[in-house]
């Protein structure tokens, strides 16, 4: 019996919505990355984009464990000499685009390459509770129920 390999035309993508309020960033990002890649499906094929479309709401209400909220530092470089920049998780979450913390966490858990970039386009993260994807009829995924460590009460 030959190993099953799914073809791109056979892929069935579902829409999933996750409420990120009170959820731990890394644990949530891990679940989202698995959904984006399609590893939760029995038909998973490493070279095919067979993951689901994931919508995340309330991304500004995610939590960190320990002192990561104030101590975790995100670095980037401007390209100019001495152009290293940094921001803490607290500064980003309290800033203009708090959803970027979760986007960056998921991005770092997805393979870096053409397929990973295509899979990241199936992720939509919103800071508030409103999203423009009601027409897709997304199915709610309750991450808090999967494991009690996924939720952190402040």
From Swiss-Prot:
MF GO annotations: mRNA binding; structural constituent of ribosome
TM region(s), chain numbering: none
Database matches in Pfam families: Ribosomal_L13
Assembly description: Part of the 50S ribosomal subunit.
Functional note: This protein is one of the early assembly proteins of the 50S ribosomal subunit, although it is not seen to bind rRNA by itself. It is important during the early stages of 50S assembly.
HAMAP family: Ribosomal_uL13
Protein name: Large ribosomal subunit protein uL13
